[in-house]
């Protein structure tokens, strides 16, 4: 920690022996050892607290990134939902219009047709008139909508 060599420690020990004396030196050395131990524990506690705070800070940053990603995904999903809803409403309106037109066409076909006036030809001067045949009734095969395939 302090980069002190063995010879420097020996010099400090000899000076302490001369200054403090041989009777009090063991007690002072024990007290200094306890103080150094407490200082090391305190430094280690501070280091571990700093590590925990750094890890918590990293976790908070990660959580914030995940929250931001979740918000962007929700926004994207809402936009997609709105787009799909608009498309569905447009298709539903178009389908309703088509159904209404088809209903009108069916109701118009069910109405009794007025007889067409007889057309006289130059070759036929008789009272014989040609009748106009009504359109043939639709068969079940004709009622199926076209699928776009030639099968």
UniProtKB/Swiss-Prot annotation:
One of its GO terms (cellular component) is TAT protein transport complex. It holds the Pfam family TatA_B_E. One of its GO terms (molecular function) is protein transmembrane transporter activity. The chain crosses the membrane at residues 1-21. Residues 66-151 are annotated as: Disordered. Part of the twin-arginine translocation (Tat) system that transports large folded proteins containing a characteristic twin-arginine motif in their signal peptide across membranes. Together with TatC, TatB is part of a receptor directly interacting with Tat signal peptides. TatB may form an oligomeric binding site that transiently accommodates folded Tat precursor proteins before their translocation. Belongs to the TatB family. This is Sec-independent protein translocase protein TatB.
């Amino acid at each position: 920690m302090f980069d002190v060599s063995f010879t420097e420690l020996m010099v400090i020990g000899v000076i302490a022996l001369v200054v403090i004396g041989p009777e009090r030196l063991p007690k002072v050395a024990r007290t200094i050892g306890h103080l150094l131990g407490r200082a090391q524990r305190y430094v280690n506690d501070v280091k571990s607290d700093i590590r925990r705070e750094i890890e918590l800070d990293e976790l908070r940053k990660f959580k914030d990134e995940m929250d931001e990603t979740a918000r962007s995904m929700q926004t994207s999903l809402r936009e997609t939902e709105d787009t799909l809803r608009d498309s569905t409403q447009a298709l539903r309106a178009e389908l309703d219009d088509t159904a209404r037109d088809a209903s009108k066409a069916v109701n118009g076909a069910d109405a009794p047709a007025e007889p067409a006036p007889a057309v006289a030809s130059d070759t036929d001067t008789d009272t014989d008139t040609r009748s106009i045949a009504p359109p043939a009734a639709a068969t079940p095969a004709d009622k199926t909508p076209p699928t776009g395939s030639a099968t």
